[in-house]
Design a protein with these regions (language model features):
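Glycine-rich, charge-decorated loop segments at or immediately adjacent to ligand/cofactor-binding or catalytic sites
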Residues: 88-93, 163-186
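Glycine-rich, aromatic-lined ligand/substrate-binding cores of catalytic
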Residues: 236-319
Length: 421
């Protein structure tokens, strides 16, 4: 029989072998920054370059795009532009990002999530081209794609070209869900008339909003502007790939998306999470967007109710935990964690609505009834008030599912014009 030390030695050796194997395996997908580098930075040579990025802008060896461009002898990186969470990712969700200087490079950093969300003309003085390199999460309400559009608008006004370094959509390139944004509901979290899950890479999306006249500002009411746009494509990416199929390391693009799987969970629970005092969705715990729980929930009853719906592609388990931070910090809460057994079959954005339906049937708790200061944000993120009104009346998924899917087929057809892969 092996001693405890012997077992530990074997486990350590196995772990080292696994690390070595992972290091030796080349990623299946080459992100845009690596393709650009292999092309000797074609399009940037001798130009003064601005860069919109955050910690997710790295190559497959974890080297930052900031450092890559800063050290390239034929590129002059002159300024950085900070989206939500900042260039170095040190600002919490919704926190104001200040302008200043990057400690590592000494470059000026202009905030695009502070006093203004669209770069001013003064911010762009002294650059010849703007580069964008941020890992997208594939959901309309994540603010990075809105920042991209506003950057493209100012660049269009000033005649400055934009180069997007493409990256994988972690939800793949085939899943499309949700209604288009309705007039009157455009905002920084629903800036374009696209579905909630749009099934495009950020480079493909940039081409679409540029060519289809969708870049109409935060409120969707401005005249569309078109910039001179170049997309540096990936190599090896295919539409049916989820992020873990790419072989690339996942670098959290924001604090609550720590794992590639969390990008799938975000659209599955994030809308529900906008109703802040309703259900905990794992924020403040180790499973952001992956749970639905509260102190007053009977986990077994909730799971049994959800099982009775036979939701395609979704499985549930009971969970009991104490959030580490937030309004329920240190309190024991109970509920369910969900898993996708068939990602293709699942309509992931409806997962949260099945949970809300079950909670209504068990506890008669309706997050949309009465005065609620979060309802406006829910509608903005949803891109419509139809869902909150209709679902709030009946609390039945079947009463909104047709509306939610009505725009999908036409959008997929439009998208095909902009497919790079």
């Amino acid at each position: 029989m092996l001693s405890g030390n012997g077992i530990r030695h074997i486990l350590c050796a196995a772990a080292l072998l696994l690390v070595a194997a992972l290091a030796a395996a080349a990623p299946r997908v080459k992100p845009g920054i690596e393709v650009l580098r292999e092309r000797n930075f074609a399009g940037l040579e001798g130009k003064r370059v601005g860069l919109v990025t955050n910690p997710s802008g790295v190559d497959s060896q974890l080297r930052s795009t900031i450092e890559i461009l800063h050290d390239a002898p034929n590129v002059k990186l002159v300024a950085l532009y900070a989206p939500e969470h900042g260039v170095r990712g040190d600002i919490w969700a919704g926190g104001k990002v200040e302008s200043g200087r990057d400690e590592r490079t000494g470059l000026p950093v202009h905030s695009l999530y502070g006093d203004t969300r669209q770069p001013t003309r003064k911010m762009l003085e002294g650059i010849d081209i703007m580069v964008y390199d941020i890992q997208d999460v594939g959901s309309r309400s994540y603010t990075f794609i809105s920042t991209l559009g506003l950057v493209m608008r100012t660049c269009a006004e000033m005649g400055i070209p934009v180069m997007v370094l493409d990256r994988p959509n972690p939800l793949g390139g085939r899943k499309v869900e949700g209604s288009l944004v309705r007039d009157g509901f455009h905002s920084f979290v629903s800036q374009y008339k696209i579905p909630y899950i749009y099934g495009l890479t950020v480079g493909e999306l940039a081409r679409m909003i540029n060519d289809e006249g969708m870049n109409r500002g935060q409120n969707g009411k401005l005249e569309p502007l078109k910039c001179k746009l170049t997309v540096v494509p990936m190599e090896g990416w295919e539409r049916d790939m989820l992020f873990n199929d790419t072989g690339l390391p996942w670098i959290l693009p924001s604090p609550n998306i720590p794992y590639a799987e969390t990008a799938i969970c975000y659209p599955s629970a994030g809308l529900c999470g906008e109703m802040y005092n309703y259900l905990n969705i794992g924020i403040g715990y180790t499973l952001p967007f992956a749970t639905f729980a509260e102190q007053w929930v009977d986990a077994d009853k909730l799971k049994d109710k959800l099982d009775s719906y036979h939701v395609p592609g979704v499985a549930w388990r009971t969970i009991h935990y104490q959030p580490i931070s937030g309004r329920l910090a240190g309190k024991l809460i109970h509920g369910v964690q969900y898993f996708y057994t068939d990602f293709e079959a699942a309509t992931i954005t409806l997962t949260q609505f099945y949970v809300m339906q079950a909670v209504w049937e068990l506890y008669k708790k309706n997050p949309f009834s009465g005065a609620n200061d979060r309802l406006s944000m829910f509608n903005k993120v949803c891109g419509t008030d139809f869902v909150s009104k209709k679902f709030g009346q009946t609390m039945k998924v079947s009463d909104i599912s047709g509306y939610w899917s009505a725009d999908v087929a036409a959008f997929i057809e439009l998208s095909k014009k902009y497919y790079i892969y």
